[in-house]
Curated annotation (Swiss-Prot):
Residue spans of biased composition, Pro residues class: 378-388
Protein name: Phosphatidylinositol transfer protein sfh5
Localization of this protein: Cytoplasm; Endoplasmic reticulum membrane; Microsome membrane
One GO MF term attached to the UniProt entry: phosphatidylinositol transfer activity
Gene: sfh5
Amino acid sequence: MSEQQPEKTVAPVAEVPEVPEIPEAPESQPVTTTAAEAPKDTVPAPEAHPETHSEPKAEPAADVAAPLPAVAEAPAEAEDTAAAEQPEPEPAAEQQPEKPAYLAQNPALGQFFDRLPAILSATGHEEMWGVSLKDSDDVPTVNVLIKFLRANEGNVKLAEEQLTKALKWRQEMNPTALVESATYNAAKFGGLGYLTTYKDANGAQTVVTWNIYGGVKDMNKTFGDMDEFVKWRVALMEMAVKELKMAEATSVIEYDGEDPYQMLQVHDYLNVSFLRLNPAIKAATKKTIEVFTTAYPELLREKFFVNVPAIMGWMFAAMKVFLSKNTTRKFHPISNGANLAREFPALKDQFPKAYGGGGPALQDGARTVNLVQEPEAVPVPAPAPAPAPAAAEPAPQEEAKEESKEEPKAEPVAEPAKADAAVTTQEAATTAEAK
């Protein structure tokens, strides 16, 4: 038995160097003992202490096995490094600027702004109502686009088409120049259009344009040149738009809320006969409506038709059939103009007395376009007698031949009558139009 013990101790010493070659089987350490003594070494743990003093060399096996977790952790560290190197999607989302509330709440408005650069490029004009159209960060620009979008009930395509037409029209018409540098004949347009601005106790401003159609002195002169009439109306409208000060806006208007950038219009039809409107008036009125509908959307808060005969109420009832509710709700016919000021209690004292207020007359306290007194063209009678001498030359010869037979006929007098007949025809046509 004593000879077997040295063999048992020598065998483990010889196998110690081989322990590192078995890193994945730490349970194999008990295998180094012989089959006969395995139960003695493993069961009575206290008794094994004296005999295991020779096994401290086996502890390096445990030390060698200790780095195993480190080797196993290496792939995890590599995965962490690879994951860190992969781009994260979060920074990309953070780079997108947050949309303003007026764009987030109204996707159609955002789409309209997406089309704005193409619109400005196609028209070559960027000014609208004194506002230089820019981007969605510019408050005045936002308000302009909201008006065009609202006028088309949120339809982006229709709003784009209208804005394009309006920009082209402003480029061609140059309405700013119609106010600043153009002049208008006082004989044709004097006393027909005014602009007033009233403020209530809180400082809120109300802009009013007045169209006094009953003040027309000569229908043919005022409405005969349709283009001239439209320019005069545009000039008055541009004066009112300038008073709205849209370019100075600092807050975006609510799409469905109050809009401070709107005006009132008053059309006075005192002494105007609705039953005898000549074609010139109808043509000028139609053209004006077309221009204003395209170029000035959502600038009208309310329109008052004053001094309208009660019998003409059917006209406004018919208008409701062809116009949208959003438009007709702004129209207010008033048979007696003196009742107009009642509609605005806070401004009653500032309205003209003729309209039920306590303020000065329009001729004294209101503004108007640049009027000039132009000399009226005096008809020159020279062209009328011109053909008479040429036609009268053969007449005396015929009279000389017939002196002995009969008295001369009044042919020389009949020739000038042709010129008079032309004048008479023109007057008759004018009278017919007036009727």
